[in-house]
Structure formats: structure tokens, C-alpha cells
């Protein structure tokens, strides 16, 4: 099982999502549970981002993605962000 850790930005985004986007928040919770077991496969079309070395992404809804890194040696998944799309500026 992987340990899950969150950036400050991701933590703030998740709180916002919990209040204003209940369907997306529900999907996020399911994805986080999957990340604990298998961070490279599962729902949300997991993909390694081409232009961000070591960063993975999963689709939460049409607009939002969860971005994360995986450290196999520490058995840790670090969530970078949970709102927006990685191409958003």
C-alpha cells in the first residue's frame, strides 16, 4: 500500500472541491483510494505526462485532473494538484 501525501495547494483545492463540486469530490475520493493500491492503473485514464517528468495525471471530470508523483522507494504518492487541467496557466 502506498502512503498518500498532499501539497498545500492540493489540500486547499480538495477543500474547495468538497464544498462546491460534490460529484467531482466523490470521484476524487475513489481515485485516491485506488492510488493507495495501484498508482499506475485504474479509473480516470492514468497517464504519465510528457512534458512534466515523473508526473502522472488522472481525469476527474471534463475540466479537472489530479496530478501526482510516485516514489516507489518510499512507497509514497504525492498529490500535486486536484483542480484544473495541467495545461491551464
Q: Which residue stretches match the model-derived regions?
A:
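Generic alpha-helical hydrophobic packing signal
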Residues: 2-5, 36
Amino acid at each position: 500500500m502506498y502512503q498518500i501525501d498532499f501539497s498545500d495547494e492540493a489540500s486547499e483545492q480538495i477543500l474547495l472541491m468538497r464544498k462546491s463540486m460534490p460529484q467531482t469530490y466523490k470521484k476524487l475520493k475513489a481515485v485516491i483510494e485506488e492510488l493507495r493500491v495501484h498508482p499506475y492503473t485504474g479509473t480516470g485514464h492514468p497517464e504519465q505526462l510528457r512534458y512534466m517528468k515523473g508526473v502522472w495525471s488522472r481525469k476527474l471530470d471534463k475540466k479537472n485532473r489530479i496530478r501526482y508523483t510516485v516514489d516507489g522507494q518510499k512507497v509514497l504518492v504525492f498529490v500535486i494538484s486536484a483542480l484544473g487541467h495541467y495545461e491551464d496557466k
